[in-house]
Amino acid sequence: MKETPGRNFRNHQKKYFKAYLAFLVFCICFIARLLSGQPGNAENQYPDTGKTREISVKASAIPEYSGEPYIILEGNTPDFTDNDLTEKSFENYSELDSLGRCGEAFSCVGQELMPDEERGSIGHIKPSGWHTVKYDTVEGKYLYNRCHLIGYQLTAENSNKQNLITGTRYMNQNMIPFENETADYIKETGNHVLYRVTPVFEGENLLAKGVRMEAYSVEDDGEGVCFHVFVYNVQPGISLDYATGKSRLD
């Protein structure tokens, strides 16, 4: 039977209406995806441990050393985001830059990452700015230590070049209380702590001005461990050339 003009028009209307509905559903889904910012459930997203994010820490924003070994940053509140929060252990270390300098070291520390053996030798590692030099005024004589960004007691990383910087004896000693606080909490509770240490270099200096240390206990929302500090890479009584790592008595 031959279709009448009216019937033909109604058929076209139905086709256009179905196409319009399909397009409308597509637009709604697309907009919802953009607004969510994630292709899936955000609660199930974990940090991408295969790539280190760029964390901006400018040396110029850090006050000059004034006699205290460290300062508190941002009200002692770390800069972790909601997407960083996870109870799944991981560790991630930045590639050395063109000057051989370390970058951010980031981990969610749990008991499963902690060492079960004594630390080995790291004397063969020569971080950027390294010099073997002694002063009678320095405890233990040696001015510089090979400082772990994330302490060995936390992630069992010993001779990892991406986790070792040239640090004064003074800085190394003043990082340890923060490491101990974190390690003791994890051993006592079995919980996890987000832990990030970022060396801060000025320009193309080979010696870091210091390190930014952040930690946050995950399961109890920071009740157990929560700090955000900058520890200075200085040695009282010794002048340091941060461009090269050379030093002299004041």
Residue ranges of each PLM-predicted region?
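Intrinsically disordered, low-complexity segments enriched in glycine/proline and serine/threonine
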Residues: 5-6, 21, 41
